[in-house]
Amino acid sequence: QQIYTAQPIHQVEPLTVSIFNPSGTTALYDAIGLTVHDTENRIESMEARDRPDLVIVAILTDGQENASREYNNKLIAEMISHQQEMHNWRFIFLAANQDAFATARTLSIDPRRTKSFEASPEGTRAVLSDFTDMVAEERSSWASSLYFYLALTKKHYMAINSLN
């Protein structure tokens, strides 16, 4: 069930039972697959100058896969690996009621970007706080590597120009 897609955060209303009513099943692979495809298509349709420099996909689940019809574990792992290797996407996996690290491993998600949590209001608050820290760290790490790359590029550019 997709409730919000590419909405500015200030336009997103808090989830309530009138907006989101859990069904008791978890089509985890379908949710991930559709999100990756939709995000990829949205990015490809943008002008190059408008494309995001960093894509972080957060997966939050309170149940194990038990209802997907379009995607399977192998296909999702391949999709995630492709986006990580070819486009440097970051995937964060937050899961309750399962071995989050074992599930993340089967999906090709880095264990450093994985958290397990208790399926309770307190557990959810705690993992979302951890998630905020993880996103800040990813952004900081990305900015540092971009700065390093630009500094290296400038150094090489200056070295090449000094040869002329």
Regions found by a protein language model. Give the residues of each.
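Acidic, low-complexity intrinsically disordered regions
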Residues: Q1-N164
